[in-house]
Amino acid sequence: MSDDTGDVIDELFAVIEDRKANLPEDSYTASLFTHEKGENAVLEKLGEETTELILAAKDDDTEELAHESADIVYHLLVLLSMKEMDIDDLRAELAKRR
């Protein structure tokens, strides 16, 4: 695993938080925070991406598996932000599970 994986996730979360605060009109991320379905829009995306991940795994399609995994991580980070949580909350929970 690359040493900068944590940095990439931290950077992505910072972008998500910025989009949440500033709500640029042309931002997919901002649209998730203002969607008429609210958090259900993100929950639906997580369900959809999880199904796609399962199918990629069953097909042994590692390229698609990586793509769908990234989609899940992204939407999970959006959900954490919606719930006023952050990366440190996730890190703390993962640390408990070592």
From Swiss-Prot:
Pathway in which this enzyme or protein is active: Amino-acid biosynthesis; L-histidine biosynthesis; L-histidine from 5-phospho-alpha-D-ribose 1-diphosphate: step 2/9
Gene3D superfamilies in alphabetical order: MazG-like
One Gene Ontology cellular component: cytoplasm
Primary localization: cytoplasm
Top-level taxon in the UniProt lineage: Archaea
Enzyme's top EC category: hydrolase
Enzyme Commission number, as recorded: 3.6.1.31
CDD domains: NTP-PPase_HisIE_like
GO BP term (any one): L-histidine biosynthetic process
GO molecular function, one term: phosphoribosyl-ATP diphosphatase activity
Keywords in alphabetical order: Amino-acid biosynthesis, ATP-binding, Cytoplasm, Histidine biosynthesis, Hydrolase, Nucleotide-binding
Family under the similarity heading: Belongs to the PRA-PH family.
NCBIfam families hit by this protein: histidine_hisI
Protein name per the record: Phosphoribosyl-ATP pyrophosphatase
